[in-house]
A protein has these predicted regions:
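Substrate-binding/active-site groove segments that recognize
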Residues: 61-81
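Extracytoplasmic
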Residues: 44, 63-65, 117-119
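Sec-dependent signal peptide cleavage junction
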Residues: 28-37
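Long, amphipathic alpha-helical surface segments
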Residues: 36-57, 72, 86-89, 93-94, ...
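Alpha-helical segment that forms one wall of the substrate-binding/catalytic cleft
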Residues: 79-110, 114-134
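Structural recognition of the beta-strand scaffold that forms the well-ordered cores
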Residues: 48, 67-69, 121-126, 155-156
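Hydrophobic core
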Residues: 20, 24-28
């Protein structure tokens, strides 16, 4: 005998239809639209960046650009009377929004999940470097996209620390900052304890070139 197909109740039909509709919506969504948390910089992250940048009440020139407060871009004539630390803090927080958006967009575009302290480390890099490191062909960005867990501590530290040049020159202050950011990214430590575990070698060509 051939069995008749089981009849579905109306509630079951509605549940099945809803489930199929939801599955279709999820299938049509791009990968970056799936749930990825967005972040803002933590209080600890802000303090760390301010420590890196140092405070200047008046505008100063660095590498052809003008800055004030905690390393915030400005025009040389913007603040003729200088600014207070409180004003500098607000200027930096306003500027951080741009860096936060850049990092959040990277995370959403590639469905990358990170912790708060990893986000803070990337925002610190972006505030200092701009977006130049956010290129998939560059190591750190590529590691994030392909899965940072696949790489060793040394590989991650080297990928971050390579961003230590001003022009063609290595700056020790940038090396130290990158090592702090790398340690924060890996271990969530906002203080200066970790980078003592790292050693770097700076080759000087003494007038020649290093290959």
């Amino acid at each position: 005998k051939v069995r008749e197909p089981m009849k579905m109740s109306e509630p079951m039909k509605r549940i099945l239809a809803l489930s199929l509709s939801l599955l279709l919506v999820l299938t049509l969504l791009p990968a970056g639209a799936l749930a990825v948390d967005t972040y803002t910089t933590s209080v600890e992250g802000v303090r760390m960046i301010e420590e890196f940048e140092g405070f200047s009440s008046t505008a100063y020139a660095d590498n052809g650009k003008w800055y004030i407060g905690y390393g915030t871009l400005c025009e040389p004539s913007d603040y003729p009377n200088g600014i207070s630390e409180l004003e500098a803090d607000q200027l930096m927080r306003d500027a951080l929004v741009v860096a936060e958006d850049v990092v959040n967009n990277l995370l959403m575009d590639y469905s990358i999940s990170v912790t708060q302290y990893q986000f803070d480390a990337m925002v610190s890099m972006t505030y200092n470097l701009g977006t130049q490191w956010i290129v998939p062909e560059y190591r750190f960005c590529g590691y994030l996209i392909s899965g940072i867990w696949q790489y060793t501590e040394t590989e991650v530290v080297n990928a971050i620390a390579t961003w230590c040049h001003q022009g063609s020159m290595v700056r020790e202050s940038l090396v130290n900052r990158r090592l702090r950011e790398a340690y924060l990214f890996l271990y969530g430590q906002y203080d200066n304890a970790g980078p003592d575990n790292y050693t770097y070698i700076h080759y000087s060509p003494n007038g020649g070139t290093v290959e």
